[in-house]
Amino acid sequence: MGKKLQFTELDQYLFGQGTNYDIYRKLGAHPDTQNRKKGVYFAVWAPNAQAVSVIGEFNEWDTEKNPMKKVGPIGVYETFVPGAKIGQLYKFYITGAHGEELYKADPYANAAEMRPGTASRITDITNYKWKDDTWMKNRENFDPDTSAMSIYEVHPGSWMKHPQTAEDEDGFYSYRELAPKLAQYVKKMGYTHVELMGIAEHPFDGSWGYQVTGYYAPPSRYGTPQDFKYLVDYLHRQKIGIILDWVPAHFPKDAHGLVNFDGTAVYEHADPRQGEHPDWGTKIYNYGRPEVKNFLIANALYWVEECHVDGLRVDAVASMLYLDYGKKDGEWIANKYGGNKNLEAIEFFKHLNTVVLGRNHGTVMIAEESTAWPMVTGKAEDDGLGFSLKWNMGWMNDFLEYMKLDPYFRKFNHNKMTFSMTYAYSEKYVLVLSHDEVVHLKCSMLEKMPGELDDKFKNLKAGYTFMFGHPGKKLLFMGQDFGQLREWSEARELDWYLLGEENHQKLQQYVSDLLHIYRKYPALYGADNDPSAFEWINANDGDRSIFSFVRKSPTRRNNILIVCNFTPVARPDYRVGVPKKKQYKLIMDEQGLLPKGKVFKAEKKNCDNREFSFAYPLEAYGVGIFTY
């Protein structure tokens, strides 16, 4: 065999240590030329198999034509098949530890058969010519701590669809078709990043991509791996970052997938008390097994290094950290200290984040962690988990509870909007209004708001203004920036026709104005983790449900003052205490951007325990964003 594609002793050693970070360049299916014959090199890890062969379109799915040879004690099997070609389907035929016959998709496949088919597809991931050199070079200097990040969360299959036909029931846009449309929208709105859901092969559309069978394969619903790279490339050339949802917490029990891969629990724990998620009906990875850890960490590196993705949002982190997550007494096994912490998962996260961020400066690792686990964004060397950012689920829950209330009752729940500032600097946060909040009868963002339709729009504008003023990066799920009325469904596109109505059009423009102001003023993003850069002007005006606060820039120039009114009562002479005797320029109100601005001069009138103040005519559900 050629030297390049051969599973060497060094490969075996590193894989056994869990540190063969380029393992996906060896395991899987790779076009190669050996002994002057073109074909494909196949390799698979099946440590307890009795025998393995590769079957596919190149050998008429004959289980005896291409047996694979076991390489060393670690349990990797390899072979070279002359004449096998790019585009052909294949599987591994495994004689299991107990003699069972198993037909498995390739865990390291870079492409898969279109569902409901379950085979893997031969492809060449090395033949894409990137054109995003400028972006990749600049990325090395990107620092999430001091940079603007406004993320547009997108499900690619339902963002926008073709009209459905008999030949194309799904109506999906391909990655290449999606690229210019998505880039144009994101750029026009003013988002900095796109976060894509479901970009790993999954058999069931209704899982939204959270039950993965092909970790190294972009879903074939939307095209090839090369097409996916084109999407990333295109976004980068338009100066848009891309983050992927990534699901290392669990995997489904589909027979062609990872479950009982060689007739034994290879990727999962054998004991159901450790290896089963009762809530989700899925399997839990064995994070203590080096080869499994290697599979996942190399997968993260595959997306970041091979596909140029700028970061990963790690799903369901809490379910990995707690051994008793979603389980009753008797359904879980304590750790060696008798506790409920998953020590192996903790070490996995430290290893993962250290390697990914250490090898790829300027990328981000984001945790969806729903508990108060400490130091999620703390450095691994300081016993933190090493993530760059964490979703702020506490803020989200309090914010949504407050916003749903009839304005009369908000005064009794004023602390729901102020409480988050008591822990805002305990982690590095992203404020999220994600897909999870607009499904399962939770209503769309607009429909959550109280009152008549007109009031709903006003409430939402005020709420978004508060969100964009609050410390933390921002994330909005698709459709919520123009007031999608229906809940989200993966089976249909967003209700774009709503933009034919003035209210929806105005909301979309308003959100775009917020996005552009957010990016323009470092006060709103440059000191997110500096407690001295935030100051309440009045956090206690509960009777009138008005909040006012200051965001300071890292240089303390061009600071921002924000006032938000969450009742339908106008306050024509609302007095706002201010830090200094200066001019305060109104740059945005509830109608949107004010291109020329309007100046308010501070007077020597005591208000909000401050020497200076000015009167601002605050409309019903009105807001004011000022620079000074």
Predicted regions and their residues:
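Substrate-binding/active-site clefts of carbohydrate-active enzymes
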Residues: 111-113, 133-149, 155-341, 610, ...
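Short catalytic/ligand-binding loop motif for oxyanion handling, primarily in non-cytosolic enzymes
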Residues: 101-102, 160-162, 202-205, 250-253, ...
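Carbohydrate-interacting/catalytic domains
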Residues: 1-148, 176-186, 190, 454-457, ...
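The feature represents the membrane-entry module of six-transmembrane cation channels
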Residues: 154, 319-320, 369, 420
